[in-house]
Design a protein with these regions (language model features):
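Acidic-aromatic/histidine active-site loop/patch
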Residues: 1-28, 77, 87-96, 183, ...
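Cytosolic-facing regulatory segments adjacent to core modules
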Residues: 94-107, 112-157
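Anionic group-transfer/hydrolysis microenvironments
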Residues: 32, 63, 117, 152, ...
Length: 204
């Protein structure tokens, strides 16, 4: 079980992650697509499903325009409430720093979250660079078996989402069935033509 600061003690009999065959590295899934296509909803459902299967999972909600942590569950069900901004603003991001700033859900033992809080935006904290985003992802892999990253739609201006798309083990690409989504893909897919984006890992 994830054992972050502020976490209440639970019975030891129910505190172990279900064993898996062989040792495997942490898996990172980035969820990306057009605005309003349900990225956050799907990210939350996947994270909750894994947690209910007793898999350690960290859900990262990268949106700094509309902080979603207050929208996905009542704040009184959370503890150790800190902001993703605290992590990304640090000159050097470590596993310990990430662990200290993870939000813990009181009722879902295997789930931890990171995201911006109500009233915050991209200017609330010091700006960060791709190097910090890479350190952040590396630290997440050390902390949990599964990492779900709810990416922002506008990757040209969202460093964390862009780095997540490049570094994730798989990318779930989502769109709505409407003209707005078609226009979105026509605008954004040309940005992903370079090999570094590894579009062959995109699940559509």
């Amino acid at each position: 079980m994830l054992n972050f600061k502020g976490k209440k003690r639970v019975d030891k009999s129910d505190s172990k992650e279900e064993p898996e065959t062989g040792k495997r590295k942490a898996q990172v899934l980035a969820v990306w697509g057009s605005p309003g296509c349900g990225k956050t909803t799907i990210s939350v459902k996947i994270a909750k499903y894994l947690a209910e299967k007793k898999k350690n999972v960290i859900l990262v909600i990268s949106d700094m325009t509309v902080p979603m942590i207050p929208c996905i569950c009542p704040m009184d069900e959370l503890e150790n409430i800190w902001s993703l901004g605290n992590v990304l603003a640090a000159p050097h991001i470590t596993k310990g720093l990430i662990e200290e700033n993870c939000i813990v859900h009181k009722k879902i033992k295997y789930l931890a979250m990171l995201g911006m809080l109500r009233g915050e935006n991209e200017y609330t904290y010091a700006p960060y660079e791709a190097e910090q985003a890479l350190e952040f992802l590396a630290g997440l892999r050390e902390l949990s078996s599964y990492i779900i990253i709810d990416c922002g739609s506008y990757i040209a201006n969202d460093i964390l989402s862009a780095v997540a798309l490049m570094e994730a083990d798989a990318v779930l690409q989502m769109v709505n069935c409407d003209l707005k989504s078609i226009s979105y893909l026509a605008s954004q897919l040309p940005l992903l033509q370079e090999p570094k984006w590894k579009v062959e890992r995109h699940l559509k």
